[in-house]
C-alpha cells in the first residue's frame, strides 16, 4: 500500500518546538548523550560546513566547542571507553563524495578533565569515504568496538559506484583496522546496530545499493553477511536502500527504511511467514535522509520518524493503528532534516525528538507533550 502524494494528516501526538541554534552551516548529524556526566542528555551537533564540532548543554543549551579545525566532518559516535562517565567521541572527517579526493580521517576525541573545554584529537585511521561510525558490542561483554562504514570503495565513481566497499572495525587500545567484509559492491549509506537474534551480541544492519544486509560475527571471529531485503527494485543505481531503523509493535519486529539512496520513499518491512514483505507507506519525500523509530506514547508500539532535506523540507511521524500507517507532520518547512535523534531531553519520562537541518542551518528539539486526547481528534 502506498499513501497518496498528499495523505490526510492524522494528529496523534502533541509537541512543543524549541530552536537551539540557527548558524550550523551544513548541519548533518545530531547525537544525544550525556556529555558532562550530570544525568541530563546533551546534544552534539556536527555541521559539515563548519570546522568546529560543538555540543549544547542541557537544560539551558549553552554552546561549547569540542574541537576546532576539523574540515568536512561527516559522522560521529559517542561512547564512554574508559568508564569515567564522559564519552569519547569517534569522528569521521576530511570526507568527499569523490572517493579519490576523500582522505577519510577517523579520529578519537577525548576530554581533558573538563568537557566544556577543548578536547584532544587523536587520529587512528585514514580510509577513503569514511562515512558512518557506530559503537558496537560484538562480543556481548559491554565493551564496544568502533565500526566504520565508508560510503563507497576507494576507486568508485558516480553514478554507478561500481567498486567493492569495505566495512571495518577497530578495538579500543590498538585501534588496528580489522575487516568485517570487503566483498559488497556499490554504495552503503546507512548502518544501524541491533541485537538481531537476542543473543546478547550486537549485529550490524547496512542500507545501500544492495538493499538491507545483516552482518553477524560467528565462531572464531568470522563475519557472516546475509540479505534481509533488496529494497527498491529499480535498476542500479536507483536500487536498494538508504537508511534503516528497527522498531517493534508489541512483540513483532519491523524495519523502517528510506529508499532508495536519498530517496522519496518510506518503506516498512514485516516478516510475514518468515519472509520480509515490503510496504511503501509514503512516496512523497524529497531527498530523504533520516529515519528513526521510537515509542512516543509509551504504549508498546513504535512510531517512525522520517525527515527529508529537499523542499518542502518536512519531518513526519508515522503511527500504526492496527491496519495502516497514519502520518503526522512534526515540522512543515522549518528544517531540512539531515538527521534526527530521539531521547528524553527534559527528564519527564517521554522520548523527545531533536533534528538538525542542512540547508536551514538549524538545530531544534521537539518536546513530547503526550498523545492527543480522543476528544481533541
Where are these regions (language model features)?
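Beta-propeller-forming repeat regions
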Residues: 1-377
Amino acid at each position: 500500500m502506498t499513501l497518496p502524494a498528499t495523505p490526510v494528516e492524522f494528529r496523534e501526538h502533541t509537541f512543543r518546538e524549541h530552536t537551539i541554534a540557527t548558524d550550523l552551516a551544513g548541519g548533518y548529524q545530531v547525537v544525544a548523550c550525556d556529555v558532562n556526566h550530570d544525568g541530563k542528555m546533551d546534544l552534539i551537533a556536527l555541521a559539515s560546513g563548519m570546522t568546529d564540532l560543538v555540543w549544547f548543554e542541557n537544560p539551558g543549551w549553552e554552546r561549547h566547542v569540542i574541537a576546532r579545525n576539523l574540515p568536512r566532518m561527516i559522522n560521529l559516535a559517542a561512547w564512554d571507553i574508559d568508564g569515567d562517565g564522559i564519552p569519547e567521541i569517534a569522528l569521521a572527517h576530511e570526507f568527499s563524495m569523490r572517493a579519490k579526493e576523500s582522505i577519510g580521517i577517523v579520529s578519537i576525541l577525548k576530554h581533558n578533565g573538563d568537557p566544556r573545554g577543548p578536547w584532544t584529537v587523536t587520529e587512528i585511521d585514514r580510509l577513503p569515504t569514511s562515512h558512518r561510525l557506530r559503537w558496537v558490542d560484538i562480543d556481548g561483554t559491554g565493551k564496544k568496538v568502533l565500526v566504520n562504514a565508508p560510503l563507497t570503495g576507494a576507486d568508485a565513481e558516480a553514478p554507478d559506484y561500481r567498486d567493492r566497499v569495505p566495512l571495518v572495525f577497530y578495538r579500543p587500545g590498538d585501534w588496528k583496522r580489522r575487516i568485517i567484509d570487503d566483498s559488497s559492491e556499490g554504495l552503503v549509506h546507512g548502518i544501524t546496530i541491533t541485537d538481531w537474534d537476542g543473543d546478547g551480541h550486537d549485529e550490524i544492519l547496512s542500507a545501500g545499493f544492495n538493499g538491507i544486509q545483516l552482518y553477524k560475527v560467528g565462531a572464531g571471529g568470522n563475519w557472516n553477511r546475509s540479505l534481509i531485503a533488496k529494497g527498491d527494485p529499480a535498476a542500479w543505481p536507483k536500487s536498494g536502500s538508504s537508511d534503516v531503523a528497527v522498531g517493534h509493535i508489541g512483540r513483532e519486529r519491523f524495519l523502517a527504511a528510506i529508499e532508495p539512496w536519498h530517496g522519496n520513499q518510506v518503506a516498512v518491512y514485516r516478516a510475514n511467514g518468515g519472509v520480509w514483505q515490503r510496504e511503501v507507506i509514503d512516496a512523497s519525500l524529497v531527498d530523504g535522509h533520516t529515519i528513526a523509530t521510537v515509542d512516543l506514547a509509551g504504549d508498546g508500539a513504535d512510531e517512525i520518524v522520517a525527515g527529508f532535506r529537499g523542499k518542502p523540507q518536512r519531518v513526519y511521524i508515522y503511527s500504526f493503528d492496527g491496519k495502516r500507517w497514519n502520518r503526522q507532520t512534526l515540522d512543515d518547512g522549518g528544517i531540512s532534516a539531515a538527521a534526527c535523534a530521539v531521547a528524553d531531553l527534559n527528564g519527564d519520562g517521554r522520548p523527545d525528538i531533536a533534528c538538525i537541518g542542512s540547508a536551514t542551518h538549524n538545530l531544534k528539539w521537539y518536546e513530547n507533550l503526550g498523545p492527543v486526547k480522543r476528544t481533541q481528534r
